[in-house]
Amino acid sequence: MDAPDGQARRLWPHRNGHRGPSHPAQVEQPFIMVRSLFFRKRHEAEEITPIPGPLESNASGVDHLQHLQQFEKAHKLDPNLPIDELNDVDAAIATGNAEKGIEIEHALMEDNSPYPEVRAVVRNYDVDVPANTVRAWVIGLILCTIGSGVNMLFSLRNPSVAITTYVIQLIAYPIGRGWDLIMPDREFNVFGLKFNLRPGKFNYKEHVVIVAMSNAAYGGGVLYATDVLIAQKVFYGQDFGIAFQLLFGITTLCTGYGLAGLARRFLVWPAAMIWPADLVNCALFYTLHDHSISDPSKTNGWSIGRYRLFLIIGCGAFIYYWFPGWIFRGLSVFAWVCWIAPNNVVVNKVFGGQHGYGLMPITFDWSIISGFIGSPLIPPFHATANVLGGIIIFFVCVSMGIHFSGTWFADYLPVQSSESYDNMGNIYNVSRILDANFEFNETAYKEYSPLYLSTQFAMAYGLSFAAMSAVIIHVGLYHGKEIWRQFKMARHQEDDVHMRLMKKYRDAEDWWYAVLFVTMVAISFGVVAGWPTGFPAWAYVVCMMLPIIWLIPIGLIQAITNIQLGLNVLTEFIIGYMVPGRPLAMMMFKNYGYISMSQALYFSQDLKLGHYMKVPPRVMFASQLVASIWSAMVQIGVMNWAVSKIPDVCSLDQPNNYSCPNGRVFYTASVVWGAIGPARIFSHGATYASLQWFWLVGAATPIITWLLARRWPKSIWRYVCTPVIYGGTGLLPPATVYIFLCWGVVGITFNYFIKRRYTGWWLQYNYIVSAALDCGLILSTLLIFFTLYLTSANKPNWWGNVGAFQTLDFEGKAITRHLMPGETFGPSVFP
């Protein structure tokens, strides 16, 4: 079964040192990949003129104060806007000080971003360098092909490894510079199309295009549709052919892209949609292309440049990970209390990091801290605090009460596990409830067992229900007026500096995205109706309503907090009730309903990245679309090759461990939700029926917090976000409370204590430290995997790799009551 998804100081710098150098005009020679409809010839280099000083404005002081009032109203409950800045806005409005109002307006709305995090890493000017070049397209497509193929192949292996976009961002830089050394600087004319293989030095805009292509191809992991296809082909014995596979895979990706484009006025253009993860990419782009040193007067005395610091930390992280990754694996989950009492059930339940509550969050492994949830240095402090609040309230306090009271037969089950269990305490054997045709056998189910979940897994489902209702109410209350205003104003909404700079370029039209979306929907109808999928066309209509309804609310939350809420549980829940007993329909419903929205969020994040880096929107449109379609073709081709050529692929005893873990999990989920169905798990009379109350809890609590925030707008209530409290824990399981606590401790250290005490250092180095730690870890992981795991090398055989894991917690045996052979627990009659 799938797990449910998942102070500042006064800082208005004009960044006088960053108005942009005087570059000579460069005329771009575009590489026409599609028709000229998607591209335009760039006009002559257009250096952006610095915005006039406050006193040079033509608008009256009254107009500026009115603009400030509108700004204050829109950002009154904005958790990312520093209170000091909001206080100054309020003071200017209250005193009617027009001159001060003009100064503040320019600082907050015209001259730069109102958010210090964005000001720290995103330049408030545009440099005219080419982005749509042969160099960018060739490097991007090659890396897209290699990354897609390698990731697809190794996703079939357990353990698996993946080439991430951080790796692409790193290796694309030397490849681009190497291209400059090899290719000639001359203009070519092929059938009337003119282009230059080396139109100047490899630049950061080309770099962004390459990374955007990789993000579109596999930024969210391998193509999710391949899990459905593997489950269908290998475990259910169905094969509808290559046409079905390609259309299914491409429509999943491109439906999300169409939605992302249509939603960009809500999720990309507004300054408040900061997309924190993009700030790390921006910092790394500028670091790789600019090796200048820092100004000690602005960085708490540090003069080391970002580039040099990145190399030092990245190399250090690369070398260090050999210890927790191979030499002393006990450093990962440093549960020393369990080492002292390895056979004590209560100790292992309370302090165990694998299956317990993990109330001793000490780790020396960055992969534990960032591997599941992402780097804790990225989300703003209030987001980290909300996630930790949800962990402590529900997964520690409430969960302990439930577990140690024996509710939901918890005495027979571990505190946490991503597995489902039968009434003998064993992992649920789905093959026992299927007939020879892999269809649900109710008689066999009644003779076998109902399905049971660990306490944390059950709690995670309840919180997932709460998150889905909370996000709609929260966004409606906190952002409803802004959404409606942006809808009415379309592209003519009030601009920040980055939006004004982007208006230099012709936009990708709304109707392009609309045509793409409608085309993908039409093809999807053909996919579900043209083959015997058991997926009714009317159910597909319901399926597509989910991402349409939830994309903007969930996207707003992610753009503000860096926390993504998932629709996986909701899609499983709905299809299980609508079309019970059809596993393939369940898998396809989940793929179109959940993954389309998830892909739309990844595309939106990349569109914001292009927005920050001033890449022409039409170049972003074409590069992401081409990369998505090509990547789907590559991954499906590799999948078919692997299934047909690798002996015993997807079997648990496959000699090289190509056991298809993702496809196997998807198959199990299809049986549980598509065959057993949610009615037998959550409806009246079922063990977990009480979890349905979380829908109401999720809908009610945002109203309470909103009323409190309205009454005390500058109190702690402005930072409370109930969707993040409920849904920020969506990766638990397979993540654990221990992992979340370790993540939270590091996040609070950097984004609260260091940010408040050493603000200049934090603004200059925080995001590049995050990128360096992640890059060093990823490169080290890849090297260890390819040199040691693939060669079946033996790990060092000592206590740090053996004895540290010989505890009840790691063995999954920290259980209060054990059954004798033949005994069962739970009711003998069940739904």
Predicted regions mapped to residue ranges:
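Alpha-helical multipass membrane-protein architecture
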Residues: 2-831
